[in-house]
């Protein structure tokens, strides 16, 4: 009897320091073990966004293309199937076109996560982003009678983020609530968007709620509000999206939208293996929406319906809150350390880039000196 071939699957994914990609990886790994297939991860990144966040300044040059050359190795790796989390990759393509990127891998059976592509032999899995945000806005308007609702968006070229922002605008319009450009801040899905939240609140002193495009950015909202003496869930309402592991342990617990990243990762592996086994021979592009659910907690002004929270021993909630603050503080300390330790090598890189132009070289030095607050 001929032994069944053990498939080799590749995974192109970035942003693995954030919650949702980690959930994808967990689901992919578990399904791969269950189905006895090999998995190779090709980890790309978005260095431009990272440098701007870590170094606290605008970066003129992007070196994403250097990091993302690893994606090309998946083409020569003898892979049977490929899972691509397009939204997390730092892709340097003309017009940032996912279909163009998909065609590059058209010879491999492929599943795209968090992106919809219309290319043969590619299936797409993406959550119901619009439905999730619509549920949040509707709840704030109908149950809490709020009208001044701000929004912190995710990366501008990320499909999940685009759909969530569109849903915010569409749902606010549905209720006849005006939205100005100053009511929307551009985030990056990281926890370190404190400055964006500060500016948003400065521009909107009458804000009643902030809807964040994911949970990690909402944590920054908690920090900023605490510094301003605003009590989340009373003075201002905050909501997120993802229902990550820290959401229920926040003080107050974070109202959010639950999407199952682990399930999405498993579904991608099941889909690939099913097609590789010949059980789904179709070559046409197929997209599926993964359902989400609204998780009502206390940060939106509701009283939690989580019975287990009512049974929480006295003092345990406070301990969890302190632990969350400690973790966030340690992350901020790490960011501060990275800013200091990376400044010199990045300075050397930028100066080297303009070495042939004396005026540009001197201008670069002056800009860096201003960043160091020296004259």
Q: What are the residue ranges of the model-derived segments?
A:
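Bacterial carbohydrate/catabolite-sensing allosteric modules
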Residues: 1-357, 363, 367-372
């Amino acid at each position: 009897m001929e032994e069944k071939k053990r498939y080799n699957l590749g995974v192109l994914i970035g942003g693995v320091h954030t919650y949702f990609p980690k959930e994808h990886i967990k689901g992919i790994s578990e399904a791969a073990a269950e189905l006895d297939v090999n998995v190779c991860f090709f980890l790309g990144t978005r260095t431009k966004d990272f440098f701007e966040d870590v170094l606290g300044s605008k970066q003129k040059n992007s070196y994403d293309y250097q990091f993302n050359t690893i994606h090309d190795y998946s083409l020569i790796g003898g892979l049977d199937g490929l899972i691509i989390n397009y939204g997390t990759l730092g892709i340097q393509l003309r017009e940032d076109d996912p279909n163009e990127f998909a065609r590059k891998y058209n010879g491999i059976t492929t599943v795209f996560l968090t992106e919809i592509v219309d290319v043969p032999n590619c299936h797409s899995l993406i959550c119901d982003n619009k439905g999730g945000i619509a549920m949040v806005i509707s709840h704030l308007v109908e149950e809490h009678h709020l009208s001044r609702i701000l929004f912190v968006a995710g990366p501008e070229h990320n499909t999940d983020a685009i759909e969530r922002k569109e849903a915010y605008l569409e749902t606010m319009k549905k209720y006849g609530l005006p939205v100005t450009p100053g009511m929307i801040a551009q985030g990056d899905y990281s926890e370190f968007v404190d400055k964006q939240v500060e500016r948003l609140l400065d521009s909107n002193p009458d804000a009643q709620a902030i809807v964040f495009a994911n949970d990690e950015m909402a944590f920054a909202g908690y920090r900023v509000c605490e510094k301003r003496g605003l009590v989340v869930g009373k003075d201002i309402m905050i909501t997120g999206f993802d229902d990550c592991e820290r959401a229920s342990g926040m003080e107050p617990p974070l109202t959010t939208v639950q999407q199952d990243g682990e399930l999405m990762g498993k579904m991608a592996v099941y889909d690939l293996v099913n097609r590789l086994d010949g059980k789904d021979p179709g070559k046409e592009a197929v997209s599926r929406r993964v359902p989400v659910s609204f998780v009502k907690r206390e940060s939106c002004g509701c009283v939690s319906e989580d019975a287990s929270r009512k049974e929480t021993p006295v003092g345990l909630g406070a301990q969890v809150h302190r632990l969350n603050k400690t973790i966030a503080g340690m992350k901020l300390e790490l960011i501060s350390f990275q800013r200091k330790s990376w400044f010199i090598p990045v300075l050397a890189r930028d100066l080297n880039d303009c070495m042939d132009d004396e005026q540009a070289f001197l201008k670069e030095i002056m800009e860096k000196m201003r960043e160091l607050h020296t004259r």
